[in-house]
């Protein structure tokens, strides 16, 4: 389904929060949206693996890595796991790696930066907790919308039918 965050802001500005423009797109899909699932972890991605093994249809994983860019929280293997399980997208407040492979995958991925160093594989962190970055607090069950222009957040799903009637 087509989305345009600029048009969504024109219509729903009073209902959405706009994430600060600190993210770049690294996935093969430029527009994505879905219900938020959150994980908070620092330089390890064991919990991320556990979450991405779940059915991700209609869901976007928000990863609060503390803004650290010393280790990549998402790589090609995890992104492929997300694709295989139907996730709509991943937003990483941290780093990703294996960018050439990520760009070929059928998933949206936004992150702060690339780095070649991988994360530890420990299951340390918290799942489904509020996370705050980019000037916005993300709650589990919120709805996030992302494209190349930006990322916006809503407590309720936004009506998208008018964008897809053309």
UniProtKB/Swiss-Prot annotation:
Subunit architecture: Homotrimer. Binds to both RNA-binding sites in the C-terminal region of Rne and to RhlB.
Location in or out of the cell: Cytoplasm
Keywords: Cytoplasm
Name used for this protein in its record: Regulator of ribonuclease activity A
Protein purpose: Globally modulates RNA abundance by binding to RNase E (Rne) and regulating its endonucleolytic activity. Can modulate Rne action in a substrate-dependent manner by altering the composition of the degradosome. Modulates RNA-binding and helicase activities of the degradosome.
Record keyword Cytoplasm present: yes
GO function terms (MF aspect): endoribonuclease inhibitor activity; enzyme binding
Originating species: Pasteurella multocida (strain Pm70)
Cross-referenced PANTHER family: 4-HYDROXY-4-METHYL-2-OXOGLUTARATE ALDOLASE 3-RELATED (PTHR33254), REGULATOR OF RIBONUCLEASE ACTIVITY A (PTHR33254:SF29)
Biological processes annotated in GO: regulation of RNA metabolic process
Any one Gene Ontology cellular component term annotated for this protein: cytoplasm
Family under the similarity heading: Belongs to the RraA family.
């Amino acid at each position: 389904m087509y989305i345009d965050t600029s048009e969504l802001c024109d219509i729903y500005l009073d209902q959405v929060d706009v994430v600060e423009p600190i993210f770049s797109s690294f996935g093969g899909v430029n527009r994505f949206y879905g219900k938020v699932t959150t994980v908070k972890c620092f330089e390890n991605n064991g919990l991320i693996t556990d979450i991405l093994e779940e059915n991700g249809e209609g869901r976007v994983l928000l990863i609060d890595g503390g803004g650290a860019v010393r280790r990549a929280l998402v790589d090609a293997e995890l992104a492929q796991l997300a694709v295989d399980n139907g996730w709509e997208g991943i937003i990483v407040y941290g780093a990703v790696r294996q960018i050439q492979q990520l760009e070929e995958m059928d998933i949206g991925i936004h992150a702060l930066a690339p780095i070649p160093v991988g994360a530890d594989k420990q299951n340390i962190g918290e799942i489904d907790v509020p996370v705050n970055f980019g000037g916005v607090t993300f709650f589990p069950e919120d709805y996030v919308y992302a494209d190349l222009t930006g990322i916006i957040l809503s407590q309720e799903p936004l009506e998208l039918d008018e964008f897809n009637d053309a």
